[in-house]
C-alpha cells in the first residue's frame, strides 16, 4: 500500500428547521492503485459508466462507503470485489457529477 485515499460516509441529520442536511465523515486509508481491465471498461461502458480508478485496500479498511476522494477529486464507488486469495477488496471508482 503506497497511496492514501479518502473514504467518505454520508448521512443526513435534521437541522433546527427540520430540514435534512448532509453530514460527511471522512477517513483516510492506505491503498494502491491498479489498472482497470478491458473487460471492466467494456462492462461499465454498457451501463453508462466511465471507470477511472481501481483502488485496492485491506478489507478491514472498507466500511461500505460509496464516495471517495483522491487528489481533491470526488469519485463514486460503483462496484466492489473481494479478492478470494487475499484479505483485500477492490473499489472501482467513476467520476460523477454531483458526488
Question: What is each residue range found by the language model?
Answer:
Residues 20-99:
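Short, conserved turn/kink motifs that form compact alpha/beta structural patches or helix kinks used as
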Amino acid at each position: 500500500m503506497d497511496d492514501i485515499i479518502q473514504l467518505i460516509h454520508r448521512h443526513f441529520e435534521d437541522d433546527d428547521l427540520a430540514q435534512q442536511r448532509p453530514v460527511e465523515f471522512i477517513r483516510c486509508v492506505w491503498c494502491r492503485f491498479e489498472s482497470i481491465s478491458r473487460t471492466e471498461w467494456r462492462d461499465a461502458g454498457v451501463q453508462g459508466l466511465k471507470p477511472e480508478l481501481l483502488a485496492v485496500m485491506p478489507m478491514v479498511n472498507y466500511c461500505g462507503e460509496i464516495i471517495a476522494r483522491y487528489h481533491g477529486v470526488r469519485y463514486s464507488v460503483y462496484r466492489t470485489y473481494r479478492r478470494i486469495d487475499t484479505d483485500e477488496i477492490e473499489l472501482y471508482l467513476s467520476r460523477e457529477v454531483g458526488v
